[in-house]
From Swiss-Prot:
Biased composition (Basic and acidic residues): 514-527
Source organism (scientific name): Macaca fascicularis
GO MF terms, alphabetically ordered: antiporter activity; organic anion transmembrane transporter activity; xenobiotic transmembrane transporter activity
Name of the protein this chain belongs to: Organic anion transporter 3
Sugar attachment sites: N86, N102
Localization of this protein: Basolateral cell membrane
């Protein structure tokens, strides 16, 4: 008997499982708001220099730019006498008296004047937020192994609620950035624990469906954010609105049970048995739960216990040539996906289309993208799907370089297509990486992969700063990186209908150029298949 069969005995997909997935899914729905929040809280409105004291408005004060609109960062030097020389002979100066913003909505940009020479601080704030997700994954992943999944989940809810609320009351920009960093740490802890607890408590046959449902919670969250931002024009109130629900999630998380596998592996089998019996009673199978014994539970988790005792590190990912090649190619694919994804997801403002409508479109494209991904993974395979997703995304981003700014519709279509391809890439990578790495080192491999996508998402906003040198440079960098990631995926083996490797030595028996996938009995395939997890970019394993 396996743990899956024990799960069947206590209710399989009963009331507990549906409530469990719902409790885990609601925070994910709201987590998308935090992840993409700076699209609206850091929006940069049209602006120009504030007039000097006692100066009258007019073209003799604010010069006109090449586009026929007032310059955003320069003004004419105001003469001390009443005479006004010819515009072509006048010198210009920075906005010494601040700026005037043509918007009824406020943001961190308008409050702290993050424009002109200070506009780099806006991108830096997003990078520091992403750095929080990166550091949180490294620190909280280790703490989760030591103290359990549920305590980390509960503390992460509280951390995100408190730091998000703190950001809403930040008196200065540096304080705001610190709180956003802590928000990133909280998001990482929520992601890590949610994925593990969702997969563990759902039977094998339902994991793909429930994982898909949980993934779509993130997608739905992308629809909610524009509505909230439109209804709440003040960035502080918007920040507070998306943070307060996590205080409620903090309280509800006390109902969430701990990972049974973690309890058994850490010598807390008695507590694990009590939880299983509680779940059985909740599902109307109290008698089945009472018949479970400690010896039976330990016996059926003996394999997990044995694997846990075998300690592997990131260095083992480079032990044999095939594993080294896989790790390099997967790392590049993960980096490219995170790097390019956030170039589009956080660049909604650049396409000259209504910010709220475009964000809804950007969120909506994930729905068909993930559905097409599921079909492609099942019929074309992981290798083809992964390579195609990144290559097409890279091509779309590079094409943006050659489309004039006035062709807004064409640029928007390319951006939406590219974002859909990158969403597809994320969905594929979660499954593909899990299938490629052997069981004994799978968690380590997923952790390293997650690290690289966080590095990519952290560097992505900083690359936008290169646009001040030449506007086309960022898209060139994003596009080429995506193409490199897609090219790297071409060197990975196909895993469709292949048995999952248990040990590192099993990889040495794999043929890199196997043309015909081995057909297996459906029952055997179901027991080996790792479910597709078409989550958002921040719902991966760590």
């Amino acid at each position: 008997m396996t743990f899956s069969e024990i799960l069947d005995r206590v209710g399989s997909m009963g009331r507990f499982q549906f409530l469990h997935v719902a409790i885990l899914g609601l925070p994910i729905l709201n987590m998308a708001n935090h992840n993409l929040l700076q699209i609206f809280t850091a929006a940069t409105p049209v602006h120009h220099c504030r007039l000097p004291p006692n100066a009258s408005a007019g073209p003799w004060v604010i010069p006109m730019g090449p586009n026929g609109k007032p310059e955003r960062c320069l003004r004419f030097v105001h003469p001390s006498n009443a005479s006004l020389p010819n515009d072509t002979q006048r010198s210009m100066e920075p906005c010494l008296d601040g700026w005037v913003y043509n918007s009824t909505k406020d943001s961190i940009v308008t409050e702290w004047n993050l424009v002109c020479n200070s506009n780099k601080l806006k991108e830096m704030a997003q990078s520091i937020f992403m750095a929080g997700i990166l550091i949180g994954g490294l620190v909280l992943g280790d703490l989760s192994d030591r103290f359990g999944r549920r305590p980390i989940l509960t503390c992460s809810y509280l951390l995100l609620a408190a730091s998000g609320s703190g950001a809403a009351f930040s008196p200065t920009f540096p304080v705001y950035v610190v709180f956003r960093f802590l928000c990133g740490c909280g998001i990482s802890g929520i992601t890590l624990s949610t994925v593990i607890l969702n997969v563990e408590w759902v039977p094998t046959r339902m994991r793909a469906i429930m994982s898909t449902a949980l993934g779509y919670c993130y997608t739905v969250g992308q629809f909610i954010l524009p509505g909230l931002a439109y209804a709440i024009p003040q960035w502080r109130w918007l920040q507070l609105t998306v943070s307060i629900p996590f205080f409620i999630f903090f309280l509800s998380s006390w109902w969430t049970p701990e990972s049974i596998r973690w309890l058994v592996l850490t010598g807390k089998s008695s507590k694990a048995l009590k939880i299983l019996r509680r779940v059985a009673a909740f599902n109307g199978k109290k008698e089945e739960g009472e018949r479970l014994s400690l010896e039976e539970l330990k016996l059926n988790l003996q394999k997990e216990i044995s694997l846990a005792k075998a300690k592997y590190t990131a260095a083992d990912l480079f032990r044999i040539p095939m594993l080294r090649r896989m790790t390099f190619c997967l790392s590049l694919a993960w980096f490219a996906t995170g790097f390019a994804y956030y170039s589009l997801a956080m660049g909604v403002e650049e396409f000259g289309v209504n910010l709220y409508i475009l964000q809804i479109i950007f969120g909506g494209v994930d729905i068909p993208a993930k559905f097409i991904t599921i079909l492609s993974l099942s019929y074309l395979g992981r290798h083809t799907t992964q390579a195609a997703a990144l290559l097409l995304a890279g091509g779309a981003i590079l094409a943006l370089t050659f489309v004039p700014l006035d062709l807004q519709t064409v640029r928007t279509v390319l951006a939406v297509f590219g974002k859909g391809c990158l969403s597809s890439s994320f969905s594929c990578l979660f499954l593909y990486t899990s299938e490629l790495y052997p069981t004994v080192i799978r968690q380590t491999g997923m952790g390293v992969s997650n690290l690289w996508t966080r590095v990519g998402s952290m560097l992505s906003p900083l690359v936008k700063i290169t646009g001040e040198v030449q506007p086309f440079i960022p898209n060139i960098i994003y596009g080429i990186t995506a193409l490199l990631g897609g090219s790297a995926a071409l060197f990975l083996p196909e895993t469709l209908n292949q048995p999952l490797p248990e040990t590192i030595e099993d990889l040495e028996n794999w043929s890199l150029r196997a043309k015909e996938p081995k057909q297996e009995p459906e029952v055997e395939k179901a027991s080996q298949r790792i479910p597709l997890q078409p989550y958002g970019p921040d719902l991966g394993s760590s």
